[in-house]
Design a protein with these regions (language model features):
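Motif I (Walker A/P-loop) of helicase-class P-loop NTPases
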Residues: 1-6
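Conserved Walker A/P-loop ATP-binding site and its immediately adjacent core
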Residues: 13-37, 260-261
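Loop/turn-to-beta-strand initiation segments
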Residues: 15, 74-77, 100-103, 125-129, ...
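Inter-Walker segment of RecA-like/P-loop motor cores
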Residues: 40-87
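Conserved helicase ATPase core of P-loop NTP-dependent helicases/translocases
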Residues: 51-71, 252-254, 262-311
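SF2 helicase catalytic motif II
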Residues: 82-84, 92-137
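Conserved RecA-like P-loop NTPase helicase motor core
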Residues: 112, 275-393
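Interdomain helical connector at the RecA1-RecA2 junction of SF1/SF2 helicase-like NTPases
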Residues: 141-250
Length: 409
């Protein structure tokens, strides 16, 4: 809403391009614009049935013909997915339009640092606004720099602590649940760590030789992803989830899973316990997704299991708790997951966040100790961010201290 107010400070002849990562976010923006400016014209670019070229062409004709643009009475918004907005056809469509008539809003702007989306930065807009709860891309300083070059530095920041104090987000308690890697899982994690160290050393040597910063290679990123996946899918998480399931008596809980395989493991547990649940996956039809959200909203089901697609932006029905099974060291992922449960229509509500924290096995050989320490540090970095805004932070800090002492970490 704030970005729409900002966009309306420009003349009505200024066309507003709004870029978003997913189609559901296009739908949300469309709903907000219709409520905010009922007389506006909205062109959708990026959905299956989109005919944006036919719709946008006549809109841009007066700009190309040097017509009297002061006569324009209604604003035009172009809602598009990042994939469409970075397409050369879309970028070229704006080439002969003076930049003073174009403003661009990027929702979840961190996505635009990806190499295949950076073509968006060739749209010459005079006014630019980037939105993100987590604007920095992890392990991608090159992509971060590209975003800053186009949008400039941060102009306004509003953190979660302040939002909770101001009553825009609900208070919450944080509950870490510890899952231990088995020997085989940690050995694989250690092997990838050693391989990654070698590749990063080569990368730094190359940067030093060329005298400039370079984006990480695809191979290094793949190693990072493979190593992260071992933590996300640690087998002990399923048992921890089962124990949690048997001890909890809450309703309307979000469960964040890594992939379909992990989701199926959790579903088998829910079937045993008799708890009611629905799924929300990217490969579902929109009608199925909407049905799942509606059932969850009405309280017809106790749990909503999701794979990543609820991480960003999408408005999720009010819920009392979330379980992060697919725990991650990506600041963007866990901050956005926390945000899903803190949005509230009831200011008196206190949300509960259950986070499965992965720790190394006790039985490791001396040469693996550095990798074990680094792993627990990365997990604790996430835990610290979660704890710092929690109502029960004193109790949690004591619990974590005792757990780490027990594992001699």
């Amino acid at each position: 809403i704030t970005s729409l107010f900002a966009s309306n400070t420009a003349p009505k002849s200024t066309i507003t391009i709004i870029c978003v990562p997913t189609v559901p976010l296009i739908q949300q923006w469309e709903e907000e614009i219709k409520k905010f400016d009922k007389l506006s014209s909205i062109i959708i670019a990026g959905t299956e049935k989109s005919n944006w070229k036919e719709l946008l062409g006549p809109k841009l004709a007066p700009y190309r013909l040097n017509s009297d643009l002061t006569k324009i009475q209604n604003r035009t918004y172009v809602l598009c997915t990042n994939k469409t907005a970075s397409n050369t056809d879309f970028v070229n469509f704006w080439n002969d339009i003076p930049s003073k008539y174009i403003q661009l809003i990027a929702d979840e702007v961190h996505h635009l640092g990806a190499p295949d989306l950076q073509n968006i930065f060739n749209i010459n807009s005079s006014r630019r606004l980037a939105l993100s709860a987590t604007p920095e891309r992890q392990w991608d300083s090159y992509g971060n720099q590209k975003i800053l070059e186009y949008f400039g530095k941060t102009v306004f920041e509003y953190d979660i602590k302040q939002a909770i104090r101001d009553g825009f987000l609900t208070h919450y308690t944080y509950h870490p649940l510890f899952a231990e890697m088995n020997i085989d899982e940690f050995q694989e994690y250690y092997n990838l760590t050693q391989e990654m160290k070698q590749e990063i050393a080569k990368h730094k040597q190359k940067e030093k030789k060329l005298g400039k910063e370079l984006p990480l290679s695809y191979f290094v990123k793949r190693l990072l992803e493979q190593r992260a996946l071992i933590k996300k899918k640690t087998s002990d998480k399923v048992k921890i989830f089962e124990d949690w399931c048997n001890s909890i008596n809450q309703k309307q809980i979000l469960v964040f899973c890594e992939d379909t395989e992990q989701m199926e493991d959790l579903i088998s547990i829910l079937n045993k316990t008799g708890k009611r649940y629905v799924n929300y996956k990217s490969d579902m039809k929109n009608s199925q997704k909407n049905q799942s959200l509606e059932m969850f909203k009405k309280g017809e089901t106790e749990l909503l299991l999701a794979i990543r697609c609820l991480d960003e932006g999408l408005d999720v029905p009010d819920c009392s708790a979330c379980v992060i099974v697919s725990s991650s060291t990506s600041i963007r992922e866990f901050v956005q997951r926390r945000g899903r449960v803190l949005r509230t229509t009831n200011r008196d509500k206190i949300a509960n966040i259950y986070d499965i924290v992965v720790i190394p096995p006790k039985e490791i050989i001396p040469e693996q100790e550095d990798a074990a320490d680094a792993m627990i540090k990365s997990e604790m970095d996430r835990v610290k961010i979660m704890v710092d805004c929690a109502d029960n932070q004193t109790d949690v800090k004591q619990e974590i201290g005792e757990k780490l002492q027990y594992y001699e970490l």
